[in-house]
C-alpha cells in the first residue's frame, strides 16, 4: 500500500476538483471538512453568485449537523472505519453563540461514550452553510 491514499466515497456528497474527501496515511484517516450536503446532488448556481458544491439539506443547525455527521459516517465507511474510530473533531460554526447548544445536542446523539477530542470555533462559512466538520480517525490496517 502507498504511504498515503485517497479515500473515494461513491455514495457521498459531490466530489470537488480541488481536494480529496479524505486521505488515509497508515493507520489514520484524515477527513476534509464536511457540510450538510445531500448525497448525489450536483453543484448548482453560478460561481461567485450563490454557487453551491451540491444541495444543502433544508432546515437549521440540527438538520445540517445530522447530515454532516452522516456524510462523515459514509466517508469513514468507504475507508473501512466507523464514527467510533474518530479520535479528533474540528467543528466550525457560522454563529457559535446561536448554534452551539443545538449542535452539541445533536453531536452527543452520535458520540455518547468516549467522545473524540474536539475543538469548536466560529468561522465565516460559505453561502448558507451553518456548520463544517473535519475529523481524524484511527483505524489500523491490519
Can you annotate each of these PLM segments?
Residues 1-70, 74-87, 93-142:
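N-terminal presequence-like segments and the immediate start of the first folded domain
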Amino acid at each position: 500500500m502507498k504511504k498515503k491514499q485517497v479515500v473515494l466515497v461513491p455514495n457521498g456528497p459531490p466530489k470537488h476538483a480541488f481536494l480529496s474527501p479524505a486521505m488515509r496515511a497508515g493507520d489514520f484517516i484524515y477527513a476534509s471538512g464536511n457540510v450538510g450536503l445531500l448525497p448525489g446532488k450536483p453543484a448548482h448556481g453560478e460561481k461567485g453568485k450563490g454557487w453551491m458544491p451540491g444541495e444543502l439539506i433544508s432546515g437549521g443547525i440540527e438538520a445540517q449537523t445530522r447530515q454532516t455527521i452522516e456524510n462523515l459516517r459514509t466517508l469513514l465507511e468507504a475507508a473501512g472505519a466507523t464514527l467510533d474510530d474518530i479520535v479528533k473533531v474540528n467543528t466550525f460554526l457560522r454563529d457559535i453563540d446561536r448554534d452551539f447548544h443545538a449542535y452539541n445536542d445533536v453531536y452527543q446523539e452520535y458520540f455518547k461514550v468516549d467522545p473524540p477530542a474536539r475543538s469548536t470555533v466560529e468561522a465565516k462559512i460559505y453561502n448558507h452553510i451553518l456548520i463544517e466538520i473535519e475529523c481524524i480517525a484511527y483505524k489500523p490496517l491490519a
